[in-house]
């Protein structure tokens, strides 16, 4: 006990010599004040972090609500039994950034998975007691009893046309939706199966996953229960989280965070491989089977990579179909182009005369991605590559004009960038 008291005295009253303390009588008081201020500030940070965590991370609520409706026979799905009866879905780390969209890493049948579930309807504290009935009424209200399979097919086709555009490939996508709904392969779609698939289609990211299932760089869909779904896990998560503790991130200025990411993140050749994958993903979004898609929040936070440094788009929430963006922007009232913004950075020009937004975006996906890559690839780049890489990235970043009118130049710049990076890492262990 004597040693503990001595240690506390040294911490609280500062390890200065008695002579110095005698010369500066106010120093002891200041040290006590600063020590307790540090304790208070640390306690406050811990409190804020964990109160924020409890609000953002509500996976238990999601599971309770989903399983309640599964047991009532309202919903169905390929992972319902494993989730609610066999308890084979293990919820691990919370990755949610907003309360309404729950994201967890997990384990299912010995596979690393990402678990995603929306709980917007349950977050109102006044309505928590009747959370399950509200989701039954609000989210799982369609199709209604008595709907034929033909009517459900037409209903699905109409929904996809509204969100992806009137494309000749949509009937094939409707076929995929119906095959997915019939998860037990009994050649019929029950009302619970139809309600579950319809609810999933209302989730923007699920619609994108379905549209991009054939693409190499989108996460693969593994199963669902109601509007909860599992995708393959992304072992190394997003770039922004590279070994930075959650409590430390808000305290560090962006410049210092960037420096730490370069120091703690992958070696430059691995970063080049990830960047090539991101550029290939930009190609996949441009005039694919189900139309063109826009990246409307172009940040490294949405990007992930596998254990072998193959790029995977970890979060598709802010990727939007061209038809959806056009519908949002066309005819919208505006004073400046900033009023014509979908998501974070999908911006269209403002017609000052008509005071209405136009439907075409100003900046293509590639220009926004290249702006990210300048900060990610140039630091630590090989000396013999840095100048040419910097020039090409600057050229790419300045791509302008309406996104629908830069196709040829877009493809040429993208091809040059991929070739430059690939030549540097090909025939090495990094390729």
From Swiss-Prot:
Lumenal side: 52-431
Pfam families in the record: PIP49_C, PIP49_N
PTM note: Among the many cysteines in the lumenal domain, most are probably involved in disulfide bonds.
SMART domains: PIP49_N
Cytoplasmic-side segments: 1-30
Cellular component annotations (GO), alphabetically ordered: endoplasmic reticulum membrane
Compartment annotation: Endoplasmic reticulum membrane
Membrane association type: Single-pass type II membrane protein
Presence of the UniProt keyword Magnesium in the record: no
Entry's family note: Belongs to the DIPK family.
Record's protein name: Divergent protein kinase domain 1B
Species this chain originates from: Homo sapiens (Human)
């Amino acid at each position: 006990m004597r040693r503990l008291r001595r240690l506390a005295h040294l911490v609280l009253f500062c390890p200065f010599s008695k002579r110095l303390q005698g010369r500066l009588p106010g120093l002891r008081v200041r040290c006590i004040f600063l020590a307790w201020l540090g304790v208070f500030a640390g306690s406050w940070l811990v409190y804020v972090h964990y109160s924020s965590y409890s609000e953002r991370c509500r996976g238990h609520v999601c599971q309770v609500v989903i399983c309640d409706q599964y047991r009532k026979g309202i919903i169905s799905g390929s992972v319902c039994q494993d989730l609610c009866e066999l308890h084979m879905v293990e919820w691990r780390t919370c990755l949610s950034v907003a309360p309404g969209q729950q994201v967890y890493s997990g384990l299912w049948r010995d596979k690393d998975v990402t678990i995603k579930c929306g709980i917007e309807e349950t977050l109102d504290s006044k309505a928590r007691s009747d959370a399950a009935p509200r989701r039954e009424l609000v989210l799982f209200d369609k199709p209604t009893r008595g709907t034929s399979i033909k009517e459900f097919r037409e209903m699905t086709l109409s929904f996809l046309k509204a969100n992806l555009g009137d494309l000749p490939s949509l009937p094939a996508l409707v076929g995929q939706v119906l095959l997915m709904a019939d998860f037990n392969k009994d050649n019929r779609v029950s009302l619970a199966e139809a309600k579950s698939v319809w609810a999933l289609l209302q989730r923007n990211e699920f619609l994108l996953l379905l549209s991009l299932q054939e693409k190499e760089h989108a996460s693969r869909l593994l199963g669902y229960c109601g509007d909860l779904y599992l995708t393959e896990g992304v072992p190394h998560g997003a770039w922004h989280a590279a070994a930075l503790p959650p409590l430390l991130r808000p305290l560090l200025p962006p410049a210092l965070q960037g420096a730490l990411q370069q120091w703690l993140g992958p070696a430059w050749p691995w970063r080049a491989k990830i960047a090539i994958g991101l550029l290939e993903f930009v190609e996949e979004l441009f005039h694919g089977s189900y139309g063109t898609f826009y990246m409307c929040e172009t940040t490294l936070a949405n990007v992930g990579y596998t254990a072998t440094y193959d790029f995977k788009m970890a979060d598709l929430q802010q990727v939007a179909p061209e038809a959806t963006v056009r519908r949002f922007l066309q005819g919208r009232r505006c004073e400046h182009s900033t009023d014509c913004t979908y998501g974070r950075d999908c911006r269209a020009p403002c017609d000052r005369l008509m005071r209405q937004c136009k439907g075409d975006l100003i900046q293509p996906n590639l220009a926004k991605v290249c702006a990210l890559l300048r900060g990610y690839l140039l630091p630590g780049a090989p000396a013999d590559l840095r100048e040419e890489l910097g020039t090409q990235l600057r050229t790419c970043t300045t791509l302008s004009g309406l996104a629908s009118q830069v196709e040829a130049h877009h493809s040429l710049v993208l091809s040059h960038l991929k070739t430059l990076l690939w030549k540097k890492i090909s025939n090495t262990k990094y390729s």
